[in-house]
Amino acid sequence: MSQLGHRYLMESDEESVRLDLKTDTDAVEKQALWAGIEPGMRVADLGCGAGKTTFVLNQLVGPAGSAVGVDMSPQRLDYAESHYSHAGIEYVCKDIREPLNDLGMFDFVWLRFVLEYYRHESFDIVKNISKILKPGGILCLIDLDCNCLRHFGLSERLEKYLIEIMEIMENKFNFDPYAGIKLYAHLFDLDYQDIAVNLTPHNLIYGELKETDNYNWTKKVEMAAKTSGCRFQDYEDGYEGFFKEFLDFFSDHRRFTYTPLISCRGRKPVAD
């Protein structure tokens, strides 16, 4: 997802493909059903990226429902239109930090893997998108905790620099490695009702490395390391040495990696 006046940390010519490949449609369906999506609903997928999730949500609401995918990146939306167009789906280019009233009202609003890019504005974004949700409608927030930080089998040196990279991203680039742990508080502070929380592993990687995990993590670490400006002084060849050690670690079948995924859903209060 890219937003006006906000640097999207993963931006590259290959980002639409990365988002497409990493999206597990079975997981999206399971999460949406858990949150309470139903046939006939009008759904907003905010930060829709490549459109794959919007397509799944539209299938779940069926022909009596509809889905609007919203993203600020024209490149993502072009990809979505080319790969995930369908009757009942509309893609719109908008900044979710700005008023969204012209989109109309929705029964179900979905925000997945977006707040991690807005450490300082996350609550304001949730408050803003809540305005397009009908009273009694469902808001579903999904994000990661300890993002990119839970590994076993790596050297102390590699672990040190992975932590340093994420600290730089957090302090200088508004990235939030701990976005998931805050989701419940966002809904609680907006007086949402029937709040439910689910905790599952998002990445659970051990043994032989899947090609999709290899591609996704390679791109994530490459982009974060380069963007951070970290000097990697403990490596004779700097970034190249760091990146090679990460690739060697990640391809080792002994390696164990996971990322906690926190899903939170609630119903918007019905006015008296």
Task: Describe the role of every protein-language-model region.
Residues 140-209:
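Conserved catalytic/acceptor-binding region of the Class I
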Residues 123-138:
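A short glycine-rich, Lys/Arg-flanked "PGG" loop and its adjoining helix->strand segment in the class I
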Residues 190-191, 261-272:
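Core SAM-dependent methyltransferase catalytic element
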Residues 22-41, 56:
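Conserved alpha-helix/loop element of class I SAM-dependent methyltransferases that forms part
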Residues 100-109:
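A short acidic, Gly/Pro-enriched loop at the edge of an enzyme's catalytic core
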Residues 44, 50-99, 124:
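Class I SAM-dependent methyltransferase SAM/SAH-binding core
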Residues 62, 118-119, 133-135:
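Helix-to-beta-strand junctions that scaffold the AdoMet/dcAdoMet cofactor pocket
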Residues 5-8, 13-15, 198-255:
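C-terminal helical/coil "lid" or tail adjacent to the Rossmann-like core of SAM-dependent
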